[in-house]
Amino acid sequence: MMREERLLKVILAPHVSEKSTNTAENNNTVVFKVAVDATKTEIKAAVEKLFEVEVKNVRTVNVKGKTKRTGSRFGKRSDWKKAYVALNEGADIDFSGGAE
């Protein structure tokens, strides 16, 4: 069993984009921005504990940071990890937080 402290550090934020909205509506899948060193097992445990839902499976993607230019200097944004969390039938996570 993982420590609760670690589970709280695994999920950083929900990832909201056009693609993630479509997958949420069509495939009952939620997309999260997660810690780079997080494993699929940790992500599954964290989502089940924090949102009290049943997780079907977890798929992860390492996203490479973009190269950006400011004047004559080049820099690079940090790499990050994205997790597609498929929920069981009937399970739902509401991020609107009661907004009407």
From Swiss-Prot:
Signal peptide from the UniProt entry: none
Gene Ontology terms: cellular component: ribonucleoprotein complex; ribosome
Gene Ontology biological-process annotations: translation
Gene3D superfamilies cross-referenced by the UniProt entry: 3.30.70.330
Keywords, comma-separated and alphabetical: Ribonucleoprotein, Ribosomal protein, RNA-binding, rRNA-binding
UniProt keyword Iron-sulfur, yes or no: no
Gene Ontology terms, MF aspect: rRNA binding; structural constituent of ribosome
Pfam families attached to this UniProt entry: Ribosomal_L23 (PF00276)
Keyword RNA-binding: yes
Classification via SUPFAM superfamilies: Ribosomal proteins S24e, L23 and L15e
Domain of life of the source: Bacteria
Function: One of the early assembly proteins it binds 23S rRNA. One of the proteins that surrounds the polypeptide exit tunnel on the outside of the ribosome. Forms the main docking site for trigger factor binding to the ribosome.
Protein family according to the UniProt entry: Belongs to the universal ribosomal protein uL23 family.
Quaternary structure and interacting proteins, as annotated: Part of the 50S ribosomal subunit. Contacts protein L29, and trigger factor when it is bound to the ribosome.
Protein name as annotated: Large ribosomal subunit protein uL23
Gene assigned in the entry: rplW
